[in-house]
Each structure stands twice: as structure tokens, then as C-alpha cells.
């Protein structure tokens, strides 16, 4: 099924419909670039490259004030295909406009009428030539979908097959814009016929690993009332600015989001001290974060060891309590 939704005109254009369901799923040969379901561990996040400033834009154009006062979702959101069917959810391949870039990704949708809470999942930096759509974050997205969450997972700009915009020092503003555009499309389409028919806009969480954690923090700073809870996993939280330094990179003064921080103590990509310092800063702001540190674990937890299952267990419990609003008692 190939569907384009234009948010400007509110028109639904069905370009073509191809029914290719055999035993409830699309053959693997018909999928876009994809790993086997036993190999979604994929590449691990790597350090963000050092970039030379190439933009002629003034820093104010990357400010939170500008991001808060501009518009989003002024383009097309394409449901490219039903990508795969599982026992508890379906995965759709989607493409959407984000300013001058075309962003690819997928959406996991549980079966049933819902309403279902929503998680936006943001991957870390991986060498673009190594990045694939179903990478290491897929296992987390799938576990959340099986637990009854709609999961939106964009391939941010510069990560194939999404468009590669000019790289510049913009404090992750371009990536943040990609997320804010996705959020605008979700809001427009929620409750209407389509993959977001069962989405509950009152229950949204966000999850970010590595640079994805920094992007989540920027997004929360722009949308302080939107997210019920956030998971920051090995997050880049001190490199571009802090929540206390007044730099304008982050602003948590109005953020009411519940925050859970996770970091491996042997992380040689993003030092664990970044998350320890973030925990101290958030406590100074009376944000009462959860903070977990995992002995012997690297930047991306070893899938076959104790830490990754424990991290996922804590993730589900945290989102269930603060996004689903399920009491621990």
C-alpha cells in the first residue's frame, strides 16, 4: 500500500494499492534493506564526528525560541508499505518531508483498536555507510510494540536512506526539526483512518540513545508539555551545553517530563560522567530523575548479557507507569 497524506491540503492521495500478504506478512525479498529478525543488533552507536562549521546562518537561527515559533508538518507523510506482520503488531515503512529533506523510518503499530500510547525512538550516531533502518534500536522498538505502544522510529537526516543535508554545527537543530515535523504529522493524523487511528496524543513518551538522547532533550525543551516520560540511554548531555548553563541549548525550566537515565560504566564513546553530571543537574532543578549505571557495560549494552534485559525491563516499567499510567501497586 502506497499512501501519501498532504498535511497542507488535508487530502489523502492513494497512488497505488498492492496487496502482497502471504500468511499475514510481506515476503522478505520484497522489503527494503533489512536485516534478519535474529540479527537486528546491527551496528552500535559510535562517536559523533567532529565537524567544521560550514553554515553561514547565525546561531540565533538554531535557538529554542526560533524552534518554538516556527511551523512543522508542512509537507507529505507517506505510508510506503506494510513492511512486516508479527504476532502482536505490524511494522510500516514510512517517508515524510522535513523541510528540504526526505526522512525515512518505520512505525510499529499494535493490533486492535486502542487507544495506544506512543513512543518516539531516536537512534544514536552510526557511520552512515554502516547504518540500516532496522539497526540496534529495533529490538527496543519491537519490545515496546509488543507491550502495547505505537513506536515511531525515524532515520534522521544524513542516515541512509534519508536525505543527507549539509552537515553543520547547529547543536542538533536539524535532527530536532526532523522529530518536531514527525510529531506534527502524528498530531494531524491521530484518530483518523490510517496507522495512527489508535494513537493517544495524551500519552506520548520519547526514548533516545547517544546523540538521540541529546535530540530528545532538545525536543523536550521545545515541547515541555508534550512528553510524559523520557528514557536517556548513554546520552550526549554535556557536549553542546547543559540544562544549567543558560546556553539556550536546553531549557528544562518548564519541563514536567519524568526522566530515566541509563549509562554503561565502561562507555568509551560518551563518558559515564556525562550522565552522572546530568543527574546532579536535574536534582538541582528538582526534576527527581531515575539514574541507573551498569557495571562493565559499554556504550551500547551487550545484547547477550545481564544489562540489556534489565534495561529493557526498567524501560517497560517506567513507560508503563508514566506514559500508560499503570500504577506499580
Residue ranges and their predicted role:
Residues 114-116, 121-164, 239-240:
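Short substrate-entry loop that stabilizes the transition state in hydrolases
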Residues 25-60, 329:
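Ser/Thr-rich, Proline-interspersed low-complexity disordered segments
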Residues 276, 285-329:
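C-terminal catalytic histidine-bearing segment of alpha/beta-hydrolase fold enzymes
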Residues 170-193:
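Alpha/beta-hydrolase active-site loop
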Residues 255, 261-263, 267:
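Short beta-strand/loop motif that positions the catalytic acidic residue
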Residues 130-132, 219-257, 284:
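Mobile cap/lid helix-loop segments that gate and shape the active-site cleft of serine hydrolases
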Residues 67-113:
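N-terminal cap/lid segment of alpha/beta-hydrolase-fold proteins
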Residues 195-209:
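Alpha/beta-hydrolase fold nucleophile elbow
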Amino acid at each position: 500500500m502506497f499512501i501519501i497524506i498532504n498535511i497542507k491540503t488535508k487530502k489523502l492521495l492513494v497512488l497505488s494499492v498492492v496487496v502482497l500478504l502471504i500468511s499475514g506478512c510481506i515476503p522478505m525479498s520484497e522489503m527494503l534493506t533489512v536485516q534478519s529478525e535474529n540479527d537486528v543488533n546491527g551496528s552500535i552507536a559510535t562517536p559523533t564526528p567532529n565537524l567544521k562549521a560550514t553554515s553561514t546562518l547565525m546561531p540565533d537561527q538554531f535557538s529554542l525560541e526560533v524552534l518554538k515559533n516556527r511551523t512543522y508538518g508542512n509537507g507529505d507523510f507517506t505510508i510506503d508499505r506494510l513492511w512486516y506482520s508479527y504476532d502482536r503488531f505490524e511494522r510500516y515503512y514510512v517517508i515524510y518531508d522535513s523541510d528540504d529533506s526526505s526522512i525515512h523510518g518505520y512505525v510499529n503499530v499494535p493490533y486492535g483498536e486502542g487507544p495506544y500510547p506512543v513512543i518516539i525512538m531516536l537512534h544514536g550516531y552510526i557511520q552512515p555507510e554502516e547504518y540500516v533502518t532496522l539497526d540496534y534500536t529495533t529490538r527496543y522498538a519491537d519490545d515496546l510494540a509488543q507491550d502495547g505502544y505505537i513506536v515511531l522510529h525515524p532515520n534522521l537526516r544524513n542516515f541512509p536512506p534519508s536525505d543527507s543535508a549539509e552537515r553543520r554545527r547547529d547543536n542538533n537543530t536539524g535532527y530536532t526539526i526532523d522529530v518536531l515535523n514527525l510529531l506534527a504529522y502524528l498530531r494531524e493524523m491521530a484518530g483518523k483512518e490510517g496507522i495512527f487511528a489508535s494513537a493517544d496524543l495524551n500519552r506520548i513518551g520519547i526514548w533516545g540513545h547517544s546523540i538521540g538522547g541529546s535530540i530528545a532533550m532538545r525536543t523536550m525543551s521545545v515541547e515541555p508539555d508534550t512528553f510524559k516520560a523520557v528514557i536517556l540511554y548513554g546520552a550526549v548531555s554535556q557536549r553542546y551545553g547543559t540544562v544549567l548553563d543558560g546556553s539556550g541549548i536546553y531549557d528544562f525550566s518548564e519541563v514536567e517530563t519524568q526522566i530515566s537515565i541509563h549509562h554503561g560504566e565502561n562507555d568509551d564513546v560518551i563518558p559515564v560522567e556525562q550522565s552522572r553530571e546530568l543527574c546532579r543537574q536535574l536534582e538541582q532543578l528538582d526534576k527527581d530523575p531515575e539514574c541507573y549505571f551498569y557495571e562493565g557495560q559499554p556504550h551500547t549494552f551487550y545484547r547477550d548479557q545481564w544489562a540489556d534485559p534489565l534495561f529493557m525491563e526498567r524501560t517497560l516499567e517506567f513507560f508503563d507507569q508514566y506514559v500508560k499510567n499503570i500504577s506499580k501497586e
